[in-house]
Amino acid sequence: MKRYAVILAAGQGTRMKSKRYKVLHPICGKPMVQHVIDQVSKLGVEKAIAVVGFGAEQVKEQLGSQCEYALQEEQLGTAHAVMQAAPHLRGLEGVTIVVCGDTPLITAETMEMLIEHHMAAKAKATVLTAIADDPSGYGRIVRNEAGHVEKIVEHKDASEQERNIREINTGTYCFDNETLFQALTKVTNQNAQGEYYLTDVIEIIKADGGVVSAYQAPSFEETIGVNDRIALAEAERIMRARICRQHMKNGVTIIDPASTYISAEAVIGRDTVIYPGTVIEGETVIGEDCVIGPNSEIKNCYIGHRTSIRHSVAHDSEIGSDVTIGPFAHIRPLSKIDDEVRIGNFVEVKKSTFGKGSKASHLSYIGDAEVGADVNLGCGSITVNYDGVNKHMTKIEDGAFIGCNVNLIAPVTVGQGAYVAAGSTITDDVPGRALAIARARQVNKEHYVDRLPGKKKS
């Protein structure tokens, strides 16, 4: 049987108190609605329709061709939102799952079970329910003797007995597609809010003799909707724990999951250890047997095997195997660090390459540079790359040795195997295997201090 999906993503989200469109708020680095679409895409749907309203263009920019779009110009309720998908789905045979774009924790596994239960029950509609510790504010599920849905009672309309029911309506449904769009034509807005509600579709289907079933989600957490910053933080916490658990199941050691942030897209190899206070963002790939953290920030990096990054920041760069970075190093975007490199404490690397086995162990800035293999950069080495208008390249060839407190004024090349004496300011190219000394000769003034006014002779 063919499957379709409608993702409700038109709400403004006024309780978020934000300029950002609600469903675009990120959870673990990915917009809420993207989490939902990613899970829906695993269901093998023929069509996925995102119903958009406020911020429609931003949502389209985020989701692109992953789905089709229907515009809800006025937000007149959930049934009205689904009605906007009619031009895409009306008259098609199959089942349609309706899910909210602000439920980022829902999984494909739960939606798959919802669809399978719906089909096994030969239902016209199936409600995804959950057991809530505190069901206040939620619609309660009242079941009949057969276990099907007798009615959905909103909290404000529920009797004392009905309010004791902990099974709630999550707002996710599975419908027979043709039945859904037939019932939508009968929904009215004769209520205090003047809106069209999807729960009325359930009543219409029941009145027409259709079976309305219910499938209970494995956990309430999976079904929560994000309507304010408090719920956003809660969803972030749950998603972060879920991501950490999956990595740990895959063989990654995470010392303290509660203080570790890993994006949904990150890939981490087995036997890697993640220490507390570490943030791994974006599409980062980390190899096996690495040590990351504590207190490190990695974003959109490719990292090889057996690499250590401690108390450091690395963004948008490629880092090889058996590399040591930190503490307190900063690898800025577009850098490429080859195998067996050492980037030590208080070293900043910007848009530069380091060849195999090279070292910059302390207090250096290497920007817009090509550093060859087996190069040693002494403490305080600086590539002076900016002339106030343009950035210029520094090239340091294989085996070069740069002494402490050296300024390399770009554009400049230090040849293969060359030495640069400590304290030099290099403005011209240094030939291979040469020694460059670019500092004034030391002059000692004998008895100078004795001649200063007010100084006693010793």
From Swiss-Prot:
Keywords: Acyltransferase, Cell shape, Cell wall biogenesis/degradation, Cytoplasm, Magnesium, Metal-binding, Multifunctional enzyme, Nucleotidyltransferase, Peptidoglycan synthesis, Repeat, Transferase. GO terms for molecular function: glucosamine-1-phosphate N-acetyltransferase activity; magnesium ion binding; UDP-N-acetylglucosamine diphosphorylase activity. The active site is at residue 362. GO terms for biological process: cell morphogenesis; cell wall organization; lipid A biosynthetic process; peptidoglycan biosynthetic process; regulation of cell shape; UDP-N-acetylglucosamine biosynthetic process. UDP-N-acetyl-alpha-D-glucosamine binds at residues 8-11, 22, 72, 77-78, 139, 154, 169, 227, 332, 350, 365, 376. It comes from the Bacteria. Homotrimer. This is Bifunctional protein GlmU. The lineage of its organism: Bacteria, Bacillati, Bacillota, Bacilli, Bacillales.
